[in-house]
Amino acid sequence: MDTTQSNGQTDTQGQLHAQTAEGGNDFGRRNPLEIGVQLRNLVNRGDFLTVQYAGGQLVTRLLEVDVRGRTFTFDWGALSDQNRGLLGAPRCQFHAQPDGVRVEFATATPRETRFEGLPAFEADFPEVLFYVQRREYFRVDAPILDPYVCSGRLPEGDTFRFEVHDLSLGGVGMRTADERVAELPMGTRLLDCELVLGALGRLSLDLQLVSHRSTALPNGTQRYQLGFRFLTLPGSAENTLQRLITQLEMKRRSLVR
């Protein structure tokens, strides 16, 4: 997996406990069965997670969940230094953002194991798993007919044009059959992207890749779904997106009545 270095470690539980105290809502899952369900959802969807530890971080995927044993297995990193660092870390923080929901939890030191003949990590269930769906993560599907599009340049300078799948105040989901995205590392930043939103006009925004999935179509081609978060969202852009999200949600509700 692709890795990046970090000088510190986020106190995830402290941040989310503070949010709980302020908002009056407890986002924590403490029942091992509930924790197992959330971890299995990450396995089934193939979502990427970022694991932060003292001195670094790596991007991984969950491979298997053992609810009875209260353990889970996750993918080995690409760099031996990161793997050694993680095996020696007293505490590991996991972060994921599947479908606009923030999933975060912490574990003690993981162990080296094998999964399908290959090296992997195994860790005990966390004591608490935070599952947070906040206002900025509420997503609505974009129109299929006359779809919205996002265009810009990939890190190498090549242009792209992807179809918008869904929207929130926190980011945008896109889909494409463009094979160039298969090798985009997590955390990739795409700057000055143009989001074309039909009658509401255009927005110029900086994006960062936070999720990446591929699906094989019946004809054998791959379809890629990409999730990006907005690095910054100016007030005018937020107002435009909020109006659009409200309109799309009202239209959706009118169709299901």
UniProtKB/Swiss-Prot annotation:
One of its GO terms (biological process) is bacterial-type flagellum-dependent cell motility. GO terms for cellular component: bacterial-type flagellum basal body. Its main location: other. GO terms for molecular function: cyclic-di-GMP binding. Residues 1-30 are annotated as: Disordered. Residues 133-246 form the PilZ domain. Keywords: Bacterial flagellum, c-di-GMP, Nucleotide-binding. It is found in: Bacterial flagellum basal body. It comes from the Bacteria. Residues 1-18 have a biased composition (Polar residues). Acts as a flagellar brake, regulating swimming and swarming in a bis-(3'-5') cyclic diguanylic acid (c-di-GMP)-dependent manner. Binds 1 c-di-GMP dimer per subunit. Increasing levels of c-di-GMP lead to decreased motility. Belongs to the YcgR family. Monomer. Interacts with the flagellar basal bodies. This is Flagellar brake protein YcgR 1.
